[in-house]
């Protein structure tokens, strides 16, 4: 098991975001923070890190539980814990 992993790869393997290219685009737009700091696609993440991801009007806060190079669909949800999900009003 890896001790660190690129953010874009983690998001894809954990299925928080379905494709690595989409994860990269979201990070490049500044919509992902790791431990309170805006992250780039190549930012290394580790177990215990807290992610905040903005998907349009939705903000998801998740804690990384473990890193896996590959994970089956059933195992992917064990890689993180959702701490909070909230909706925002983007029109404000």
Curated annotation (Swiss-Prot):
One of its GO terms (biological process) is translation. Gene3D superfamilies: RNA-binding S4 domain (3.10.290.10). One of its GO terms (molecular function) is rRNA binding. Coiled coil: none annotated. InterPro entries: RqcP, S4_RNA-bd, S4_RNA-bd_sf. The keyword Endoplasmic reticulum does not apply. PROSITE patterns: S4. SUPFAM superfamilies: Alpha-L RNA-binding motif. Keywords: Protein biosynthesis, RNA-binding, rRNA-binding, tRNA-binding. Signal peptide: none annotated. Residues 5-65 form the S4 RNA-binding domain. Associates with stalled 50S ribosomal subunits. Binds to RqcH, 23S rRNA and the P-site tRNA. Does not require RqcH for association with 50S subunits. Key component of the ribosome quality control system (RQC), a ribosome-associated complex that mediates the extraction of incompletely synthesized nascent chains from stalled ribosomes and their subsequent degradation. RqcH recruits Ala-charged tRNA, and with RqcP directs the elongation of stalled nascent chains on 50S ribosomal subunits, leading to non-templated C-terminal alanine extensions (Ala tail). The Ala tail promotes nascent chain degradation. RqcP is associated with the translocation-like movement of the peptidyl-tRNA from the A-site into the P-site. Belongs to the RqcP family. This is RQC P-site tRNA stabilizing factor. It comes from Listeria innocua serovar 6a (strain ATCC BAA-680 / CLIP 11262). The gene is rqcP.
